[in-house]
């Protein structure tokens, strides 16, 4: 148990999909955010700035039609690690980068900027949408 607590404080390891809430049809938004699900629906977590996040999209090819969706992941512990991001527009990959071998690259911020997120004063795009609060996939409920 102490390791888990220590990791939670020192680490950041997520692998999620993010999209703008505006990409969903308006009649679906409330049922999605209230997590009223059947076997085909997706459980979303609402972040700041109109961004939705989920750990799983069962049929990404079908769901991704006519949408902009990013797949982002982090793997950090005690400051060391990397992040990756891919951006898909209508199922076509528009961006695919990792900071694993080039720490000057900030793929998640790049993708969030492409999705219209503007960093607030003193924050980057990652913290502006609130991703810093979610350390593990299990934090997305």
Indicate residue ranges for each PLM-predicted region.
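Residue-level marker of intrinsically disordered, low-complexity segments enriched
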Residues: 2-3, 7-8, 67, 115
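Short, extreme N-terminal segment that most often corresponds to the first beta-strand
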Residues: 3-36, 140-141
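Charged interaction segments
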Residues: 40-141
């Amino acid at each position: 148990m102490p390791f888990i607590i220590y990791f939670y404080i020192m680490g950041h390891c997520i692998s999620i999909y993010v999209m703008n809430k505006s990409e969903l049809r308006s009649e679906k938004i409330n049922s999605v955010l209230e997590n009223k699900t059947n076997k085909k629906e997706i459980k979303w977590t609402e972040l700041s700035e109109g961004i939705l996040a989920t750990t799983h999209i069962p049929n990404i090819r079908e769901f991704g039609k006519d949408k902009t969706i990013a797949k982002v992941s982090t793997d950090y512990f005690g400051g060391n690690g990397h992040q990756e991001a891919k951006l898909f527009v209508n199922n076509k990959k528009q961006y695919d980068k990792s900071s694993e071998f080039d720490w000057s690259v900030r793929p998640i911020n790049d993708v969030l900027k492409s999705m219209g997120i503007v960093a607030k004063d003193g924050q980057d795009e990652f913290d502006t949408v609130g991703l810093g609060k979610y350390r593990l996939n299990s934090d997305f409920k």
